[in-house]
């Protein structure tokens, strides 16, 4: 089996996690108590969905997931919510006091008390797997727990499970919508370790997803539930090929191989189509070509950056539902002819496609319409650098005056870590710049030391 363990850290990670597991259960026909009436092989454990669920002798399906937070309120919602019987109580780990939006608390003082317990639980889940493939890590880098404890856990996972791939789904601060003053600090400090310890990181940002909800679903005032349900569709599309048998299956390791040209250039944009409300879907016929085009629209991107300002290095298109390879090839051929979608000159093919015959499911009473086919795109584009340069700029404004730094130093951090992390990000911006640069500017001579 190719099991994946999901790790949900901090409020954002947990709430996105709730939306994801709700959707997985719907897709597989698993009830809120973990029973699965449609499963004929009780305790068999060789079904495709066993990559994400483990099956007990009593025929109950338990998610291979861990939820961690430094304060109890968000996890208590899971403990008392609809799916309280789905999770094993040991999988829900909560501390007593909050990281208070402080990376240093999440990473040093409070985080380190809880991290061994987390690794212990993860070890139990891993021992239960026959062929662990990797980890999906969900967190946000603006807060204290997601950034601090998130990085700490990733660092420790690298030590314990060096060869396993780690995919991060990371909520980055938005340009306009801010939830805390020290977001830029937390993000920069956290990205410093995301660079080292994740293989692929998919950037999400609330503002971009708000706009998609407003524009495409006509929700005037989107809530986090609306946002998370949209994000969960993306994550479900990515993992569908692990959970169902399909035509062109895409493995977690394949993402890495196809999307990451250089180890540091691993921050991805994602988009999903069709995002459409039930009222509209009734009147529209969404062909493969149409949904493919709309996945490439800048307004469909789930992070606030414009792919037209950069170049694509690689794209992964995951189709699900009523889609045949012939349609996909035609749609991709059309995309390649468009002048607005530019690829770097050293990567002429640039597309990896996957097809899964399981049509997309939607949460009953949710905002999305039930459609016959959908596509999720994960792309590696040099325009992602906009996300980093925005955060770096805000970081510089605050750090020049050393504002708020004493809170971090007081929790046992050194001021040098700030400048080290900031330099690492400056180097990352530079890397993106070089990757997007054309080769014909007389660079041939000095890239002999690259390889």
Swiss-Prot record:
UniProt KW keywords: Acetylation, Cytoplasm, Cytoskeleton, GTP-binding, Hydrolase, Magnesium, Metal-binding, Microtubule, Nucleotide-binding
Compartments, as annotated in UniProt: Cytoplasm, Cytoskeleton
Cellular component, GO annotation: cytoplasm; microtubule
Protein residues bound to GTP: 11, 71, 144-145, 179, 206, 228
UniProt EC number: 3.6.5.-
A molecular function GO annotation: metal ion binding
Cystine residue pairs: none
Changes after translation: Undergoes a tyrosination/detyrosination cycle, the cyclic removal and re-addition of a C-terminal tyrosine residue by the enzymes tubulin tyrosine carboxypeptidase (TTCP) and tubulin tyrosine ligase (TTL), respectively.
Record bears the keyword Zinc-finger: no
Family: Belongs to the tubulin family.
Quaternary structure (record): Dimer of alpha and beta chains. A typical microtubule is a hollow water-filled tube with an outer diameter of 25 nm and an inner diameter of 15 nM. Alpha-beta heterodimers associate head-to-tail to form protofilaments running lengthwise along the microtubule wall with the beta-tubulin subunit facing the microtubule plus end conferring a structural polarity. Microtubules usually have 13 protofilaments but different protofilament numbers can be found in some organisms and specialized cells.
Protein function: Tubulin is the major constituent of microtubules, a cylinder consisting of laterally associated linear protofilaments composed of alpha- and beta-tubulin heterodimers. Microtubules grow by the addition of GTP-tubulin dimers to the microtubule end, where a stabilizing cap forms. Below the cap, tubulin dimers are in GDP-bound state, owing to GTPase activity of alpha-tubulin.
Protein name in UniProt: Tubulin alpha-2 chain
Gene: TUBA2
């Amino acid at each position: 089996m190719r099991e994946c363990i999901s790790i949900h850290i901090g409020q954002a990670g947990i709430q996105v996690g709730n939306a994801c597991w709700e959707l997985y259960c719907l897709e597989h026909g698993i009830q809120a108590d973990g029973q699965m009436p449609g499963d004929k092989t009780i305790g068999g454990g060789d079904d495709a969905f066993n990559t994400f669920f483990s099956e007990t002798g009593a025929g109950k399906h338990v998610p291979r997931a861990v939820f961690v937070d430094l304060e109890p309120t968000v996890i208590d919602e899971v403990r008392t919510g609809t799916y309280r019987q789905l999770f094993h109580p040991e999988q829900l780990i909560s501390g007593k006091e909050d990281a208070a939006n402080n990376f240093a608390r999440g990473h040093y003082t409070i985080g380190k008390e809880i991290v061994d317990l987390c690794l212990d639980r993860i070890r139990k889940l891993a021992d239960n797997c026959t062929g662990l493939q990797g980890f999906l890590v969900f967190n946000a880098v603006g807060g204290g727990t997601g950034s601090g404890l998130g990085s700490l856990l990733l660092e420790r996972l690298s030590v314990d499970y060096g060869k396993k791939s780690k995919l991060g789904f990371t909520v980055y601060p938005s340009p306009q919508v801010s939830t805390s003053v020290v977001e830029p600090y937390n993000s920069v400090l956290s990205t410093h370790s995301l660079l080292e310890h994740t293989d692929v990181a998919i950037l999400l940002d609330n503002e971009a997803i708000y706009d998609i909800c407003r524009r495409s679903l006509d929700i005037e005032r989107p809530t986090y539930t609306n946002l998370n349900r949209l994000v969960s569709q993306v994550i479900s599309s990515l993992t569908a090929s692990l959970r169902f048998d399909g035509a062109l299956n895409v493995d977690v390791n394949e993402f890495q191989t196809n999307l990451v040209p250089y180890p540091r250039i691993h921050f991805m944009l994602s988009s999903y189509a069709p995002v459409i409300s039930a009222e509209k879907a009734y009147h529209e016929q969404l062909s493969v070509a149409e949904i493919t085009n709309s996945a490439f629209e800048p307004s469909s991107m789930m992070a606030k950056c414009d792919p037209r300002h950069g170049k694509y290095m690689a794209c992964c298109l995951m189709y699900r539902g009523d889609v045949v390879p012939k349609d996909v090839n035609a749609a991709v051929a059309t995309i390649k002819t468009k002048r607005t979608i530019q690829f770097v000159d050293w990567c002429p093919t640039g597309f990896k496609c996957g097809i899964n015959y399981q049509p997309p499911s939607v949460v009953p009473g949710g905002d999305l319409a039930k459609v016959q086919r959908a596509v999720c795109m994960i792309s590696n584009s040099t325009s992602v650098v906009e996300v980093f340069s925005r955060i770096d700029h805000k970081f510089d404004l605050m750090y020049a005056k050393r504002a708020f730094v004493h809170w971090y130093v007081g929790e046992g951090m050194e001021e040098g870590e700030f400048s080290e992390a900031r330099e690492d990000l400056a180097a990352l911006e530079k890397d993106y710049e070089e990757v997007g640069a054309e080769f014909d500017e007389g660079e041939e001579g000095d890239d002999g030391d690259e390889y």
